[in-house]
Amino acid sequence: EVEINELHINTNERFEEKPSISIANTQVKLSNIETSVKGKPNLGNQRYLTFAKLLKESRKEGANIFLLPEFSVPYEFVSSFAKYSEKNKMAIIAGLEHWKVDDVGYNFIVSIIPVKVNGVNDAIVLYRLKNHYAHVEELIIRGYGYKVPKPKPYRYDLINWRNLYFT
């Protein structure tokens, strides 16, 4: 069973030119994945500065959308990403590191979409639980004694932002 949520955000606006997408070429360290699954993510200053540099470079290149890989962002950084999205009018889509709640290891995708509400810049933060976990990912989660969530129904968000559709 599949559930598709269609979200329309600033559909009255259009891109002046073709939208520009920045894909971060960054290393996802196994040590960061493991510490995150244990509930102690790496929130060091150097790591934060690496993300800040990638975002700044993408903005300078004129990106409208910034993509990061799976397991790359601690959820504690999401509020900073949302502020950046709001200020720079850049959508950010990233795979969050595992989020441990009780005995379950969750894997979320976050989509941060800039909006203007009554003349004020803001950002909408959308979390979606990953539907399908890789075999090795399940082994890591179970190896630490946690359960792997199985969403039912599978959920997908179809986002229409400024008349650009993506999921």
Model-predicted regions and their roles:
Residues 45-128:
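Cys-nucleophile CN-hydrolase/nitrilase-fold catalytic domain and related Cys-dependent amidase chemistry
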Residues 19, 41, 74, 114, ...:
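Proline-rich intrinsically disordered, low-complexity coils
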Residues 40-44, 85-87, 145-148:
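Short, low-complexity, polar/charged sequence segments that are solvent-exposed and flexible
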Residues 1-11, 104-167:
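Active-site catalytic loop in hydrolytic enzyme cores
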Residues 28, 99, 132:
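Residue-level detector of flexible, active-site-proximal loop/helix-junction positions
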Residues 37, 79-83, 140-144:
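Generic preference for flexible, low-structure residues
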Residues 1-65, 72:
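N-terminal, active-site-proximal structural segment of metallo-dependent hydrolase catalytic domains
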